[in-house]
Structures are given as C-alpha cells and as structure tokens.
Amino acid sequence: MPKARVTKNETAPVSSNPSANRTPVKINSAGTPMWYKVIMFAFMIVGLAWLIVNYLVGPQIPFMADLGAWNYGIGFGLMIIGLLMTMGWR
C-alpha cells in the first residue's frame, strides 16, 4: 500500500502550550475618549437644532434667509458628520 505524503505541519514539532508560539498583541481597551463622544453628539444635536431653527424662524434671521435651501444641506451635513463619527466609537 502506498504511503501518504507528509505535509510540513505534520513534521513540525508540536508544542505542549499552543499559546507559547503566538506573539502577544497589546490591545487598547481604554475605549473612545470622552471628547470624541461629546463632539460626535454635538454634531448631531447642532445639525438637528439648525434644521429646527430654520423651519421655525429661518426667514426672520437674515443670514439663514440668504442661505435658502442650503440650510438643509448644512443641517443634514452636520448630522451626517456625527453619524460617521459613530463608526470610530468603541
């Protein structure tokens, strides 16, 4: 009967402790700093406030009246920045 081919893994010495062969990796378990969370939620809240103010009194505020429909872009843009920041939150 023909003998099976021996692979490299079968000829390598087997350690009694499998974790001894691994390189330790330092894990940063500190999480997200407080300032990151504050800025993230601030972007979302300021964007929402911008849209609410624009809807309620936008035509009465001179610079908001000049911006016109760009107020929606500014409000939603601020909220999207906050939403994108949630991807880095741990």
Curated annotation (Swiss-Prot):
It is a multi-pass membrane protein. The chain crosses the membrane at residues 38-58, 67-87. Belongs to the CrgA family. GO terms for biological process: cell division. The lineage of its organism: Bacteria, Bacillati, Actinomycetota, Actinomycetes, Mycobacteriales. Residues 9-22 have a biased composition (Polar residues). Keywords: Cell cycle, Cell division, Cell membrane, Membrane, Transmembrane, Transmembrane helix. It comes from the Bacteria. One of its GO terms (cellular component) is plasma membrane. It is found in: Cell membrane. Pfam families: CrgA (PF06781). It comes from Corynebacterium glutamicum (strain R). Signal peptide: none annotated. Involved in cell division. This is Cell division protein CrgA. Residues 1-25 are annotated as: Disordered. HAMAP family: CrgA.
